[in-house]
């Protein structure tokens, strides 16, 4: 089966192909003979009921510095494609939300991965609250009294913006921390939505495990270990990728979360687990495929495309 695939992503010239999961998906699609077209989300337009974009034919190569070739832009209706990959990175802002409304108009006749309505309705730090039994104690609030009561009960906490990404603006706040007042003021000015306050898990120094689920099933995992002088394990923040196996607790988490993802059309998802605690469910633009492959793990990109092809064959 040969599919006509469009990818909605950030500028391809700027990606780091060594760690980029979108690039891994494109390489696998090309290997299977699928046609690739590219556009950036700012190019989407709706004219009446028609969703259009100036798409460019795309060829990819696993060669740093020379990893793609683009054809000339050609205005096309996106409902003429078999598949659209929704792969731009956050921020999960109004521009991102608007693009999900646009893409919802063509899905599922054109298969959008992930389902745009479900992406919109499942922000990673909110959707995870559907599974409190799997999480560390967590508060979502910007109310000072609520935050202080939570800190009094749980001691050291991590404080981060609700719609942040990539480890940006993540802080550990210790009990009686003299910086908390200034941090609260800074968050109040900078982030207008509520914030995430979560009990600090000291075992994060041993790693934050990124587990990939494809159509609700375990597909691969990588342990991300923070640098000695940093709290954050994100690989874009200097975290080191290590080979890993799932614990029984982590398999339980996958078995609990997986059906909810499958029901919502969330085909490619990354969940984050620290010491057996589920902390995030990433449905927008999950990463980890290339690190898992580099460490000798499963071919996650192949599993994603196997699943897409099966869905398009029905």
Curated annotation (Swiss-Prot):
Residues annotated to bind Mg(2+): 280, 282
Pfam families the UniProt entry points to: GSH-S_ATP (PF02955), GSH-S_N (PF02951)
* PROSITE patterns from the UniProt entry: ATP_GRASP
Which EC number(s) are documented for this chain? 6.3.2.3
GO CC field: cytoplasm
What residue stretches are annotated with the ATP-grasp domain?
Answer: 125-309
Q: Does the keyword Secreted apply?
A: no
Q: Which Gene3D superfamilies match?
A: 3.40.50.20, ATP-grasp fold, A domain, ATP-grasp fold, B domain
Swiss-Prot/TrEMBL cofactor(s): Mg(2+); Mn(2+)
Keyword Manganese among record annotations = yes
* Catalyzed reactions: gamma-L-glutamyl-L-cysteine + glycine + ATP = glutathione + ADP + phosphate + H(+)
Q: What class of enzyme is it?
A: ligase
Give the GO molecular function terms.
Answer: ATP binding; glutathione synthase activity; metal ion binding
Please give the family membership noted in the entry. Belongs to the prokaryotic GSH synthase family.
Q: What is this protein called?
A: Glutathione synthetase
> Which organism is this entry from?
Bradyrhizobium diazoefficiens (strain JCM 10833 / BCRC 13528 / IAM 13628 / NBRC 14792 / USDA 110)
Question: Gene encoding it?
Answer: gshB
């Amino acid at each position: 089966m040969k599919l006509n695939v469009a990818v909605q992503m950030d500028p391809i010239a700027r990606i780091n192909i060594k760690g980029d999961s979108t690039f891994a998906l494109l390489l696998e699609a090309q290997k299977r003979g699928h046609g690739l077209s590219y556009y950036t989300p700012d190019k989407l337009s709706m004219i009446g009921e028609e969703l259009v974009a100036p798409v460019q034919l795309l060829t990819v190569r696993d060669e740093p510095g020379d990893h793609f070739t683009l054809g000339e832009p050609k205005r096309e209706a996106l409902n003429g494609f078999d598949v659209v990959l929704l792969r731009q990175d956050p921020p999960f802002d109004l521009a991102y939300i608007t693009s999900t409304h646009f893409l919802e108009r063509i899905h599922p006749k054109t298969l959008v991965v992930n389902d745009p309505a479900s992406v919109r309705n499942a922000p990673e730090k909110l959707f995870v609250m559907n599974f409190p039994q799997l999480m560390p104690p967590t508060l979502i609030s910007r109310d000072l009294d609520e935050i202080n009561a939570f800190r009094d009960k749980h001691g050291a906490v991590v404080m981060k913006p609700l719609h942040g990404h990539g480890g940006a603006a993540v802080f550990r706040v210790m009990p009686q921390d003299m910086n908390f007042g200034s941090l609260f003021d800074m968050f109040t000015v900078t982030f207008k939505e509520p914030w995430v306050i979560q009990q600090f898990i000291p075992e994060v120094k041993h790693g934050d495990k990124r587990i990939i689920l494809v159509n609700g099933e375990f597909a691969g995992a990588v342990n991300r270990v923070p640098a000695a002088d940093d709290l954050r394990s994100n690989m874009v923040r200097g975290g080191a990728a290590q080979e890993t196996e799932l614990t029984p607790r982590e398999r339980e988490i996958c078995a609990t979360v997986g059906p909810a993802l499958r029901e919502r059309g969330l085909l490619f998802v990354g969940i984050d687990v620290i010491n057996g605690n589920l902390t995030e469910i990433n449905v927008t633009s999950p990463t980890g495929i290339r690190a898992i492959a580099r460490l000798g793990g499963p071919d996650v990109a192949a599993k994603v495309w196997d699943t897409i092809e099966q869905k398009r064959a029905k």
